Amino acid sequence: MKVQFETRRLRLRVGNAEFAALRAGDTLVVSLDWPGRPWRLALIAGDSVRIATSGEEVTLVLPRTDLDALATRLPARDGLRYTVELPSGPLDLRFEVDLHDGRTRPR
């Protein structure tokens, strides 16, 4: 899973295998060991979009129905997009399935 942060924007990209695992009920995790403070993002499928935090972990839930609908229209350049209201203001959340999934292009 690839994570990209910008001000008020979070973009997640997963490969085909990760997308299949997420839809099957697995939790996708990415972590970073900052000096003195580790950070972890867990992505799961659920009933509705929501974000929860606990210590160093952020858990992001995406609606299973939206993930299933996205699967029917792959390959698709546009993924899922949500606006999540946070205490600091709205967050633009984007979820995409990597169409190339690590394959190299011929030169």
What are the functions of these language-model segments?
Residues 3-5, 10-14, 58-62:
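Short, structured motif recognition centered on aromatic/hydrophobic residues
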Residues 4-7, 44-57, 86-87:
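Short, ordered beta-strand-loop transition motifs
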Residues 15-17, 24-25, 63-65, 72, ...:
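Surface loops and adjacent helix of pleckstrin homology
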Residues 20-33, 68-86:
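Extended Gly/Ser/Thr-rich low-complexity repeat segments
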Residues 26-47:
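A low-complexity, Ser/Thr/Gly/Pro-enriched, surface-exposed linker/loop concept
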Residues 40-42, 50, 59-61, 92-94:
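Ser/Thr- (and often Asn-) enriched beta-sheet segments in non-cytosolic proteins
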Residues 48-81:
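Mid-chain, well-packed structural core segment of small domains
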Residues 78-107:
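C-terminal charged interaction modules
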